[in-house]
């Protein structure tokens, strides 16, 4: 049984990128779906769609590669873990990697990238960083 679905999703995307796979499958949850939608919005992955097999749901993620065949994602790192939650205020999530990276934050307004969370003036639990 998987205890941390977000870490599992990040690991599956990272491993698929290293193997140069076109598509990978993630276990569905609302937070993983929101995370995948943010990655699509920010241009780190091509697309994601929810697939229902009866009761079980999964998310198919189409990965994105540069012209030389290298994955667009350089690094994905889980920050807040089940054993150690990490929370940041709005001023602490303003920029990451001089604007080249993204911090994904779980806020009271839902799961948001750092630029939208800063614009709304909210902080929250730092799920992961991507660049």
Swiss-Prot record:
A GO biological-process term: translation
GO molecular function, one term: structural constituent of ribosome
Keyword NADP: no
Protein's UniProt keywords contain Ribonucleoprotein: yes
Keyword entries, A-Z: Ribonucleoprotein, Ribosomal protein, RNA-binding, rRNA-binding
One Pfam family cited in the UniProt record for this chain: Ribosomal_S8
Any Gene Ontology CC annotation: ribonucleoprotein complex
Domain of life: Bacteria
SUPFAM superfamilies assigned to the protein according to its UniProt record, in alphabetical order: Ribosomal protein S8 (SSF56047)
Subunit structure: Part of the 30S ribosomal subunit. Contacts proteins S5 and S12.
NCBIfam families membership: PRK00136.1 (NF001109)
Functional note: One of the primary rRNA binding proteins, it binds directly to 16S rRNA central domain where it helps coordinate assembly of the platform of the 30S subunit.
The family this protein is said to belong to: Belongs to the universal ribosomal protein uS8 family.
Protein name: Small ribosomal subunit protein uS8
Native source species: Sulfurimonas denitrificans (strain ATCC 33889 / DSM 1251) (Thiomicrospira denitrificans (strain ATCC 33889 / DSM 1251))
């Amino acid at each position: 049984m998987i205890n941390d679905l977000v870490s599992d999703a990040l690991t599956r995307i990272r491993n698929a990128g290293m193997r140069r796979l076109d598509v990978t499958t993630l276990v569905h949850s609302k937070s993983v779906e929101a995370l995948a939608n943010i990655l699509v919005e920010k241009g780190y992955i091509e697309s994601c769609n929810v697939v229902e097999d009866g009761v079980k749901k999964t998310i198919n993620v189409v990965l994105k590669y540069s012209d030389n065949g290298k994955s667009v994602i350089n690094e994905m790192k889980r920050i807040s873990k089940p054993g150690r939650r990490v929370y940041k205020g709005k001023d602490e999530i303003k920029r990451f990697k001089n604007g080249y990276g993204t911090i994904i934050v779980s806020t009271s307004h839902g799961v948001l990238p750092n630029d939208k969370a800063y614009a709304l003036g909210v902080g929250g639990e730092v799920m992961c960083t991507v660049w």
